[in-house]
Every structure is written in structure tokens, then in C-alpha cells.
Amino acid sequence: MKKLALLVVVMFVVSLNAKAINDKPIMVNEMPQAAQTFIQTHFANQSVAMAKVESEIFNKSYDVIFTNGDKIEFDKKGNWTNIDCEHTQVPLNVIPAEIRNFLNQNYSGVKLLQIEKNDRKGYDVDLGNGIELEFDKRFRVVDMD
């Protein structure tokens, strides 16, 4: 039993080290073209503080952090998966029209601080008034906190 516990601990430590090794800083021009275009189009007025690639066994993702603290996460193809704009707001033209219309009708004037896209679930949205909304793939509200 002790050997099994030791083996589990060793594997855990090795996996943590492997994860740390697979996160590496990169230049924005080393990211997929779709991510570069997205940044140039929607965040042209912001300065990039750091970009990194996170490589895992079956997945690769990219993170960009701007000097004001805003952050974008991209999948391996360069499609955004999470936009976190705690210090500004998510650009309106990146929000799906159905979600944008819902927010305009029900939360007019409230900033959208974060939007996360999950291909299986839909979208999670955090508003400046503390409300969190979850939309399914058909853009219907399925949860609210």
C-alpha cells in the first residue's frame, strides 16, 4: 500500500513538472493567424504584456495578457475560447448577435466583463453588475447567478 501511495505522489509531481515545462512564452506572431487577426482587429489599441503557449498531451492553447490586465485565451486553431476584460469590457462585435440582443434588451448599459465559449455547452457571460449568465448552443439562457 505504501508503494502505491508513493507511486501516486511521484506521478503527481512529475505531471506538475511536465505541465510547467509545457507552458512557454512566445511572440504574438508565433500564434495561429486567426488569433493574430483577432487581436489586431478587436484589441488594436492595447499593448500585449505577454503571450504564451500551453502544450498538453492532447491539446494546445494560447493565452495573451495585455498591459491593462485583460486576457484572451485561444484554442490550437486560434479561435477565442475566453475573453476576460475586467478592466474594460468585451468588444461588442465579438459577442454573438443573439447574446448581444438579449443583453441589450435585459441589461442595457451593463458592461460585459467576460465571455467564455464552450463548444459542447454554449457560452458563459459575466456582467459588470455581478450577474453571471449561461447560454446554451441555441443562445437560450439556461442558468443565472
Question: Locations of the language-model features?
Answer:
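Interaction-mediating elements
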Residues: 21-145
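Bacterial Sec-dependent N-terminal signal peptides
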Residues: 1-23, 39
